[in-house]
Structures are given as C-alpha cells and as structure tokens.
Curated annotation (Swiss-Prot):
This is Serine protease vicPa. Pathway: Mycotoxin biosynthesis. SUPFAM superfamilies: alpha/beta-Hydrolases. The keyword Protease applies. Serine protease, part of the gene cluster that mediates the biosynthesis of the secondary metabolite victorin, the molecular basis for Victoria blight of oats. Within the pathway, vicPa and vicPb are probably involved in the processing of the vicA1 and vicA2 precursors. The pathway starts with the processing of the precursor vicA1 by several endopeptidases including kexin proteases as well as the cluster-specific S28 family peptidases vicPa and vicPb to produce 7 identical copies of the hexapeptide Gly-Leu-Lys-Leu-Ala-Phe. Belongs to the peptidase S28 family.
Amino acid sequence: MLCYLLIHILCLQAVLGVPYDVLPLRIPALVPKDTSLLSGRGAFQQLIDHTNLDVGTFSQSYWFNTTYWGGPGSPIIFYTPGQHAATDRLHYLTDTTLPGLVAKEVRGAVVLVEHRYFGESQPFSNLSTANLQYLTLDQVLADFVHFARTVDLPFDLSGQSHPSRAPWIWIGNSYSAALVAWTEKLIPNVFWAYYASGAMVNCMQDFWQFNYPTQQGMPQDCRYSLEAIISHVDSVFLSGSPEQKHRLKTRFGLQDLDRLDDTASALSRPVIAWTLIQPSDTHAQFFEMCDAIGNLNSSWSRGHKVGSEINLQKALGNYANWFTTSYLPGLCESSGYSDWAGRNNVQCLDTANPSWQAFHDLAVQNEDRVWDWMICNFFLLWQTGAPVSRPTIFSRLVDSMYYKRRCKLIFPEEENVTYAARVTDDSINTLTGGWNHTGKRILFTNGEFDPWRSASVSSVFRPDGPMQSTSQQPIILIKGVQHQADMYVRNRINKDVREAMDTGIAQISRWVLDFHVEKSKTLTQYTSQVYCAH
C-alpha cells in the first residue's frame, strides 16, 4: 500500500506538475544515503555584497556530520560559530553539544557554516577599513539565508534537503543566537524553527546592566568587597591627589598606564570572567579572585553567605596581590605583539596610543579586529559602570565614550568608508525589535545569572519585565547558571540545565513533526484541487 501511494504521488508530480517542494517529508529515500560521507566539509561560493552581484564572491567554508541523518528529507540542524574560526568549534557537529544532540533525537544532519571574515571564509586578503565595509548585519544574515536556499549538500544527492522540503533548525548560542533571532524576525520562512541560547538581542551603548546578574549570582561577600574596591578606585582617580593616584596605580602594577580610565578599566576587567563559568567546571578564575580577596584557602568558593562588614584596606590589599601575581603577568605578552612583550608589560591596556601594532594588524587571522568592527558598528553593548544610584563592580570612569575613542583609532576613515556611519543602538533595535522580539517557532533560553541576560528577552531591565513564554515562542530561564550552559552535554550534571535541554529538545522535535504535518496538508490540498478540477 505504501509503495502504491508513493508511486501515485510521483506520477501526479510527473504528469500534473505538482511542485517538488510539496512532497511529504517521510517518504522513503529516492536516492540511497552515501555512507562514505558521514562527515566532511565543503566550500560555498558566497556573495560578497548581496545588493550588488558585481562585487563578486568568496569561498565560505562549511562542515557537516551525517552520523544520525535519516536520509533525504530528514532535518538539517544548522549552526554557525559566529565570531570564531570554525576549525575551533567543530565539536558543535557532535553529540557532545546541543546541535549534535538534537540531530541524534530527530535523525538530522548537522551543518556548520563559518561566518564571513572569520577563519577561512575571507572575502579579501586583509582587514582594512575599506574591506570591512561588507561586514554588516544585513550581509551576515543574507549569507546564511542564501546558503540554506541554494547550497547543494554533498551528502544529499536527491536535493530533498532544501528548506522547502526538509525542516532546517537553526541553533545558536551567544552572538550566533542573536543572529538566530534576527533572522527569524527579518527574513522569516526559510528556517523552520529556531533555538537561541543566551541571545543578546537588545543593543545598548552604556551597557552597565551587564554586571547586574554577576552581582546577584556571585558570592555576596566577594560582591560587597569588589563594590567597595571599585568605589575606592573611582574616588581616588576622580578626586585624589596626584600622589594618591600614582600610589594606587603602582599598587596594582599599572604605573606605566598614562590614562586613569585605562587603569580603572584594567582593574574592572577580571569580573567579566563570571560569564565564562560553566556548571561542569572544576576551577574558575573568577572564584580564584574571590577567594584571594577574602583570603580564603578554598579554590572553589560558591557560598552566598554575607559575612562581616567589609574591611576595605584588607580587601584592597588582597585584590592587589592577586591582580599583580596571578592576573596581570603575561596578560599583554600573550598577544604576541613585540611592543607588548615582557612578563609585566601592561601596554595592551592602553587604548589611546594609535601606534600599537595591534591597531594596525590587518591580517585576516586577527579575529579581535573583526569583532571590534562589529561591536563598534552594530552591537555596541559596551560594559560600563553603573549609575551613581546603584552599587557597581565596574568603574564609572569607563563609559561609552571610552570605547568610541578606541573605535576611531582602530578604524580610521579610508576610501570614504568609516565605522558606525549613521548607526545607533536605537536604529538597530528599531530594525530588529530589540528585546521585544515576538516570533514563530523560536525558543529562547537564558541563564539566571548570565550577564548577557540583561540584553535578552528575559532581562529584568526590559520595560515590561522579562518576556513571558508562549507556545510559539517558549522562553526558558535556567536557574543558577551563566552563559549558554544548555549548549554543552557535560553540563547535564546540573539538574536545571538537564531539564532545560530536555524541554528544548522535546519542543524542537514537536516542531519537526509539525513540518511534516504541514507539508502533508499542503500535498493533500493540492491533490484535492487537482482531482476536483478533473
């Protein structure tokens, strides 16, 4: 009976011209699966400028894993590593990460596509300001949509993996999760469903809210100590004598920095490490810092008990000792630039010197320059000190102008091209919807204590409060964790992460089934219309 129905459908297609994309998904494969291509890679000729074909193309690298693929018409699990070279993120093809785990559940293939200007996917031979003009949000989104619509995947000789014939599920984390959300908003109906973990969808210039989840989740003794330390630093740098300022800089090994805002920024930087902590970690620099400030022997401080009144001078001395012995040594030298060589060199923290080699490093391997371009141009999200009405663990000497000054030095005007032309956080949020995203078949997850949560749909700073979950846009807030914890299978040791992953995978599985149902309905309706016409 099944064979008869299949032959009947194919005959209808051949005789009556039934569109190829209305064939049901779960029919037997017409072309056998090529088992020699369980994994591999390819090169896609991508448009440099999607609005001007004359600019040409570049080779965009992609990788695939068909270990769990059910054959032609089965789901495609799509992933991009965003601001990283793909060769450093190939584990996302496997079931040690969420994309591979979803593929295993729904019998899908994982396809990983490298982001333009990262890794091997380079439109030009250097990263000059003029060459970077094609690195824009709309070009990036168009890349992935164009890939999905036109790629010939080498493991599917039948062509049944086109998004109109198979459900493409885009899974993203962090920046790539924002791309997931923005694609669903701006170019819908190409990908069938979306999973966005830790998506920072609302752009802000003075992103002081970044550190709020850190303050809520970190050991509270450490929080109050850091708040007191940063308050003291700001007080000295804003109103202290020249001798007091120099003495404080020297205490932290930063006497070679000329600018006070650079020094204050350097002293604030270690708290950013909070966002890197995963539930499966057995050691974290952030807790090492907290242990040092509190003069604790433990290397893994997770307590939240509030202790006695802060002894500022003791905490300041402990922080200075940790900063100069554990954090600072080798920090600049590790960059590899000769003008930043030396174990105790601190010049990489100087953002105002246009002569630094890093500011003129146009090599395509310089991922920092590419990401700086995107931050300076589109996303902003500069981590700054909190308003004076709030306690802060990040210096108030660091504001958006501090970052803009650096952007101007890194990207001078060239061939009438400059950074951030007519782009503001308001204009980006108007385009994308910001944290007021309402979509279809898109699932958001965020960690309760993820600093990036403050720019997400689950932000407590969102005017209407954290967005509520709906059937078409489920939102999961994972208790007690930081950034993108649900992307890694090793984090399933945490009960809340495990439950979030299971819920998310179950939702994606239902949406995959919905795709088959919708396609079957389309075929039935089309066939009925044909018979009625005859």
